[in-house]
């Protein structure tokens, strides 16, 4: 019983540490809600959130809570996410909108928005290190990369050609069906199938999305007049987007051998 309690506490502590970037962002969303659309010293809420996110990123690196290698892959995901944001918030598409003004923005997207995706990348990168994660039966990186890129492209191409998300779901199931995730705590080692882990993470992000829209960080068209919970269908979107972040992290921060075993590079923490 004592060992179980120790494992639970250690797991939760490491999970909170890995998700630190995202947790701090959510707290800021709540605490700045009353700022609304008013300007304070020439800047708006989104601008202060950008400065806040930059400070968090600096502190994570300065305090060595995040490595430069991790920061590089997170930055790549950040850029790809911003490109998708610019497309999907264009008035002709309007999948969602940022309802408040900003000084620092690119077209319809405030610059802080990319850091919400950075928080996801940060969680993946830090989790792999904190839990000493090892994957077995991991597919080759080429099929994983093709799946991730097609998922990314489908977010935008579905407005012009048929939506292939269900094909991508089935492909991901076939691809990762045998993949296992091993993670280490001080007193125990655990093994889980990869697919349920991805679904759980997608659900957690869906909860964070509901918090974010409630505090008007962004809004879907149906939420503009009155807030309501984000539809369950968004779980699938987050699941597919997680694949892109995961593949980038796995490719840059680790090595996969010929038997499908993946582990962090020894230099990944430098």
Label each residue range with its predicted role.
Residues 1-270:
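Aromatic-rich, lipid-facing transmembrane alpha helices and their immediate juxtamembrane interface loops
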């Amino acid at each position: 019983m004592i060992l179980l309690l120790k494992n639970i506490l250690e797991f939760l502590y490491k999970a909170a540490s890995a998700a630190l970037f995202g947790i701090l962002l959510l707290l800021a969303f709540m605490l700045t809600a009353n700022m609304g659309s008013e300007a304070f010293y020439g800047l708006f809420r989104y601008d202060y959130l950008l400065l806040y996110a930059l400070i968090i990123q600096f502190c994570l690196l300065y305090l060595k809570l995040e490595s430069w290698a991790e920061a590089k892959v997170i930055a790549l995901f950040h850029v790809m996410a911003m490109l998708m944001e610019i497309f999907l918030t264009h008035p002709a598409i309007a999948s969602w909108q940022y309802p408040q003004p900003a000084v620092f923005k690119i077209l319809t997207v405030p610059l802080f928005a990319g850091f919400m995706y950075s928080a996801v990348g940060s969680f993946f990168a830090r989790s792999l290190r904190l839990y000493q994660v090892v994957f077995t039966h991991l597919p080759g990186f080429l099929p994983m990369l093709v799946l991730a890129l097609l998922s990314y492209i489908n977010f935008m191409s579905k407005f012009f050609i048929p939506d292939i998300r269900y094909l991508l779901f089935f492909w991901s199931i076939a691809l990762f069906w045998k993949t296992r995730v091993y993670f280490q705590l001080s007193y125990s080692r655990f093994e889980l199938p990869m697919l349920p882990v991805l679904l759980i993470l997608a659900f957690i992000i869906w909860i964070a999305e509901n918090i974010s829209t409630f505090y008007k960080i962004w809004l879907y068209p149906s939420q503009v007049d009155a807030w309501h919970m984000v539809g369950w269908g968004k779980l699938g979107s987050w699941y597919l987007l997680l694949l892109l972040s995961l593949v980038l992290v796995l490719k840059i921060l680790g090595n996969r051998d010929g038997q499908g075993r993946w582990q962090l590079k020894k230099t990944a923490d430098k």
